[in-house]
Amino acid sequence: ILLYALYGLRKAGRKLGVLASPSPDSFLCSRYVELFDQEANDFVYETLREGKPCMISKFGTTELNAVVTDLVTSEPLSWSVLKEFFRGELSLSRVQSILQLQKLSGFFPVSPDYGRRFCERVVNDIPEINILGSYIENEKYVLPYMHCKRINLDGYYAPFLWKNPWTKYLEGKKVLVVHPFVDSIKSQYENNRERLFDDPDVLPRFKELILVRAVQSIVGTRTDYVDWFEALKHMEDEISQLDFDIALIGCGAYGMALAA
């Protein structure tokens, strides 16, 4: 009842003009970032050159939203949480956050119990991150679990913008790519690699390209698995049989768990 009342008050406040609707990019934030752009790229490159196991990751917006919603609703609602809710910066509905997680990131089934298990998994995986691409204001809610360097997304996602791109490290390596679209990735690598970027170091020649097709379960896509956890275990088992030097993982809500 309280949850419905809070959402009703927020909706009424927006209609009356007392509360403003958040802008689409209001969740973006760079104030936790320690290294930007070229410095961030260089830090990633030097970290990889050390040759030690490391995890470079970022939060998906729906994944972090689910975790933060779970964390803030597990305790009595503070005034600061309520203020952020009324400003549209927080969700207080676990069901709604899991629905978004299913639609946009592939989690299933939509269930409070399964959602709680997912959030616990993420919280347990966060300490494994060595470098985080930081860009979301609500990362502040999981800061206590972090022990990592935080860089901006362009320094991580856009090596083609910088001198000595960190992806140069991939040259001569056995590179595993986990992604739903492995066929197009294979085709681009084999047929267009040298034409994709002006700087050849952005996408160098690997010793071997190893491909694993990730489970695709966004927007309720049917799979052969009972739940997200079974699908994750299938991919973990498949990857554990492979010999590779570095993994590039892009597969929605599965990504951080696989990397950890």
What are these regions (language model features)?
Residues E208, A214, I218-A260:
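Accessory, usually C-terminal, subdomains that scaffold auxiliary metal cofactors
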Residues L2-R205:
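Electropositive, gly/pro-rich neighborhoods at or near active sites that engage anionic ligands
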